[in-house]
Amino acid sequence: GSYDPELNLVYWGTGNPGPDWNGDVREGDNLYADSVLALDGDTGEMSWYFQFTPHDEHDWDAIQVPVLADIDLDGETRKAMLWANRNGFYYTLDRETGEFLLGKPFAKQTWAEGLDENGRPIRRPDTSPSQEGTLVAPIAGGGTNWWSPAFSPRTNLMYVNAFDGEALFFSREQEYNEGDNFTGGGTETGAQAPHRVKRRHPPPADVALGLAGPAVHGDIHGAVGATEQKE
């Protein structure tokens, strides 16, 4: 999560609903899953929320790190929240009110036509998991995942680790038993669902930025790399 001391708001992302891949047993938007919650720093009361993926059927939780930045948008300085979401879309929100300001894909996605004026996804038909398997991008791992992104006020660019990939999503009926894995399906990659990963510096990890220096990033093997910031 992130904290704005001026607004005294804590911003926290939430996980996906369960079962992950069988949405038939949990109708509706499934609030407040796959959302960012703005919580009062003193009381914990919710000031506002924004749901990235209503009725998520692909395990695209919203546990990415929200980046807080003051940006110029349409000639006006806005207190913004920048969020590259696991569902493959990038969002800019007003962090005071939760208003959706803009959004667009940053990774390969085939499940939505785009976002409406309120930031709600316009779903494509026949993209829900099925018994036979439904080919959808991004994969369950998402267009990005847990790794921290970064924002440079010098270049006005967001730096994020991104994946391009697609998978077959399967659904099945499953009874809930306390303590058991409750997924209601699964995913598969292979010849029919090539798991293509695109990244400039593999494998991914957090990204850190200095005021004028390069974007510094690590990998799961303990190596550290640096990439020049380009405007």
Question: Residue ranges of each PLM-predicted region?
Answer:
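Beta-sheet-rich non-transmembrane sensory/scaffold domains
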Residues: 2-231
